[in-house]
């Protein structure tokens, strides 16, 4: 059976999508129905899922996360498939959206104001391209036999100009600005490092949280019995898995 390693943040882990993956570390939010598990089932792959909620590119490459070693340590060179969904936490993308949905009084807190500050987001975005390039380069070196596929983020906002209550138009516009830069940086890193790309964002433009058939969850309080706000739901994970399967085996 071919070995498949899944790397990434909560957008790949699937926090709140039941059931949890057996043996998942505390705080990882790793679902047994995330896209990696679904792809492995469809293609009969031997899955090693090290996705972890809150992960940054540094957690993929060099830094521990809670009890987990850097995700790249899961690669042993025998992999035939590696998927990567990462980068949003480097630039505060989902925290920005969650913060924008908070009451006005809470948004005055310094840490929240910083997340909603355009200059601060631009500063964070300035280093994203290099960080994603480093991930692609390192994974290709560690897994030379593998097809390495970057999977970008599902769409989390309606089209620019469309109401996204409780987010203000200003905060929704900032969210789109970060989302577009994240998509662009992911695509550029994939091209530059010889990796492939699955464009989950483009495929989900009509399946944002405010749509009739959402693939992601919108604003709300994080509750343990449902998917985390501004993250994929079960339908979204199924859709991303299908995109990956189609990329690997178009027939």
Residue ranges, per PLM feature:
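Short amphipathic alpha-helices and their capping/turn segments at secondary-structure boundaries
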Residues: 1-5, 64-83, 132-145, 245, ...
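Catalytic His-Asp segment of secreted/periplasmic serine-dependent ester chemistry enzymes
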Residues: 154-251
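Structural recognition of the beta-strand scaffold that forms the well-ordered cores
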Residues: 5-6, 48-51, 80-85, 147-151, ...
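Conserved SGNH/GDSL esterase-like catalytic core that processes O-acyl groups on lipids
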Residues: 21-130
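Hydrophobic, aromatic-enriched interface-forming segments
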Residues: 124-168
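Catalytic nucleophile-elbow at a beta strand-turn-alpha helix junction centered on a G-D-S/GDSL motif
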Residues: 2-26, 91
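Short, flexible, mixed-charge acidic loops at enzyme active sites
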Residues: 17-20, 95-110, 162-165, 209-221
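A structural motif corresponding to the C-terminal end of an alpha-helix
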Residues: 38-46, 130-149, 181-199
